[in-house]
């Protein structure tokens, strides 16, 4: 009986000393984060890294996030959302050229809910893939806008360019 009491006391003492171990929930990588929700912001650094790795695998140089291109991408994504349709890349390229960027290019699309989906779709489209693998590109900007009442839900603007002239 005494052994049982001592064993029980020791067990209780050890249990009291044990710290609670929290099991960390695995965090979803940002390229799988849904942009189809209010307040969602695409991870520009992750986009740069994904596209940069793809470019590196194809013998091309890295990209740098450019604040001016980022602002232009945000404005373009917002413009598409306000008209509820994707824009023409030619108009965006013209604006980028007017802003002093050399060799501008753009991927404008709608309907992808995650960066992973957009990146996959762009790689599968010859026209969009050319933008990802543009040899002269050194700078990048990317943005999304969520529009809950749109058939597309999410508008994407990816812009790349060479350094400013």
Segments (PLM) and residue ranges:
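N-terminal secretory signal peptides
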Residues: 39-75, 79
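Secreted/periplasmic proteins
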Residues: 33, 46-49, 99, 105-112, ...
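Acidic/histidine-rich, surface-exposed loop or edge segments in extracytoplasmic proteins
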Residues: 27-37, 50-59, 102-103
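Bacterial Sec signal peptide processing site at the extreme N-terminus
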Residues: 11-37
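Sec-dependent bacterial lipoprotein signal peptides
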Residues: 1-15
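Disulfide-stabilized extracellular recognition modules
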Residues: 115-165
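Short, surface-exposed glycine/acidic/tryptophan-bearing loops
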Residues: 70-115
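Surface-exposed patches in mature extracellular/periplasmic domains of secreted proteins
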Residues: 57-71, 84-94, 129-145
């Amino acid at each position: 009986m005494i052994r049982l009491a001592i064993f029980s006391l020791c067990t209780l003492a050890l249990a009291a000393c044990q710290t609670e171990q929290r099991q960390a929930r695995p965090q979803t990588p940002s390229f799988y984060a849904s942009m189809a929700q209010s307040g969602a912001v695409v991870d520009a650094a992750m986009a740069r890294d994904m596209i940069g790795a793809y470019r590196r695998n194809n013998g091309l140089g890295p990209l740098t996030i450019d604040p001016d291109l980022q602002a232009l991408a945000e404005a373009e994504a917002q413009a598409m959302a306000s008209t509820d349709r994707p824009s023409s890349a030619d108009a965006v390229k013209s604006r980028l050229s007017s802003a002093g960027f050399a060799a501008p290019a753009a991927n404008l699309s709608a309907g992808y809910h995650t960066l992973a989906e957009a990146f996959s779709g762009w790689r599968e489209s010859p026209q969009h893939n050319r933008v990802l693998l543009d040899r002269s590109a050194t700078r990048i900007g990317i943005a999304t806008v969520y529009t809950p009442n749109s058939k597309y839900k999410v508008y994407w603007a990816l812009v790349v360019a060479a350094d400013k002239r």
